[in-house]
């Protein structure tokens, strides 16, 4: 057994463990280091005497001190850097801080602050994390995976860095997303950090600012495309199957065309999913189902308009159709229920241009006629307000990345059509949101139910506070990952995401829904993730693709896999 595997085994338990390290070498192991919390006895046994200040502190005191440090910093990027430094020094303390202050710190370790960190990556990096794979490594990817110091990786988040949040191609800077996402897998679902691996598939960048930067840390070439890109992805998938055959692979921030076809190509060859498509779909579906509790109406009776026909929008629309089908809706009802717009306006069959990726969501002649769009010419363009007035949607979803795209006339048209508009401007970061919640509430006369992709404060409308829930994928992907790991599922089917959405909707308390919130508090993330994981393991069992466990065994198996960041005694 390698020394790395030994570290992993020892950090998975909380009873007394033999570290295998002494002195400075022990303090340099982030998964074992306790800093000033080493006891007097441990300091003597482990040759730490004199290497630490005299006072022995508790984990709780360390958490309080770290929060004091963070709150003293001048801005959120400095807080991000401070948390990253803590993660590099003492992972148990890092995750204890996150778990205890998740609602305050989630915007720092992930959206929106991680976006700024990714943009500045080459100039703020202190210590590299994860694995970096470039086209120069295509013939030796298994060797690179073995260079990772972990022998039992169960969860990989991999990005090619081309569509980082709503910020585009950030090259090597995109690594901040897998690192941040895996931090939330651990903080949110208790997946042990020693079983996770962030991966940057650094295939270059087409962002001139980065290529011209003499301090840029990535592979300094134009982005790999076409057959060469496909060969590289194939080599990576084969290598993961070879080296980490039990790992779940989550694709992250691939551009639309690659995201859809890579998901469809590999989802049954390797246990994998795309969070931007499927995780986003599940968290949005969860918010929709929560809203339907307030509306007291079935999904199959709703009409939805999407502004944005990229991977996220198509993923949401696919899951909406699956949920409608589960309710018993027929094909015609499902096709009429969804209208999608992109940068060229309404998406319909004969439109020119129309990308192949969008054809599955394009309206046909019958659906167009049903909504009053007669004799559409290939060059016809219909904007959002026109589509809203024709379709009369009850739900409006934005994944366009276009700030201000939900205009006042569009929202007012929706409010005229339905008594309680459900408006979801989901684009990240905050600067990309389709509309501000305060504007939506004003334009809808305070009747809208609003959830956003980035965090927003409550909105006061005519003396009544409205909570703005955040449709954060972190409500879904930790539980999906944990459930897939525990179930040992051979694939991650759509049924997992619909199950996660249904579970998430049940986790939003009535008191929050009464104030307009479509999602639970982020401080409830561990409770939500556990519930989703249990449901996913049951779904895997019922579908015959996972372990055969009864319901009590499932709960025990999930609980056994959840790691709590506490210090074990060391001998």
Roles of regions detected by a PLM:
Residues 2-272, 539, 546, 565-571:
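N-terminal ligand-binding/catalytic initiation module
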Residues 7, 32-33, 275-279, 295, ...:
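Adenosine-phosphate binding glycine-rich loop
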Residues 44, 48-51, 72, 123-126, ...:
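Generic secondary-structure signature for well-ordered alpha-helical cores
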Residues 144-145, 166-177, 208-215, 259-265, ...:
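Short acidic, glycine/serine/threonine-rich loops at helix termini
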Residues 256, 349, 376-378, 390, ...:
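N-terminal Rossmann-like NAD(P) cofactor-binding subdomain of oxidoreductases
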Residues 269-270, 274-395, 547:
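Glycine-rich phosphate/diphosphate-binding loop of Rossmann-like nucleotide-binding domains
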Residues 383-396, 401-422:
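Rossmann-fold NAD(P) dinucleotide-binding segment
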